[in-house]
Amino acid sequence: MTINFKEGILIPIDKPYGVTSFKALAHIRYLCSHALGGKAKMGHAGTLDPLATGVLVLATGKKTKQIETLQQHTKEYVATIQLGATTVSYDMEHPVSATFPTEHITRELILETLQQFIGEIEQIPPTYSAVKVNGVRAYDVRRNGEHIELKPKHVRIDEIEVVSFDAEKMQLVLRVVCGKGTYIPVSYTHLTLPTT
């Protein structure tokens, strides 16, 4: 079977932990270009955080014109959340920057609180994100020590399921079905569990 990279194909890859979506794309582009003996036109549909793993869809040739359409499809994520602690990047890239009481948190309270996130919501992307500000990625601005404020954006969350909750460790695993542009770390960072 001959693959026509110029006409285009879609290549779903399992993006590894610690690799940016762009670096994953660059590596596959290099391999394809080497195999073809020339430069392969490629792009990726959507962006996964460097610390996220999962399916990243790459497109070649004429299929790159479908990237915008592909990004409109619903996505599904599974996230492990440590309740009672946060970091400046809302993930494990930085050390814990603040802690909060957790004695009042129950599975019932979590289920009740999660309902406020279902539907169309406004979400402020994390400053350590791939959002571009004046042509520069927000995480590059932050890593240069500069302060940045991002504007809220409308996102859609269709479903949130509690996969597991470990009350002793205060760890929560969620499955989230959502639309384009949803930042999962932000969704659970703003999961305010009120004290009684």
Predicted features and spans:
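Catalytic/RNA-binding core of pseudouridine synthases
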Residues: 1-186, 191, 196
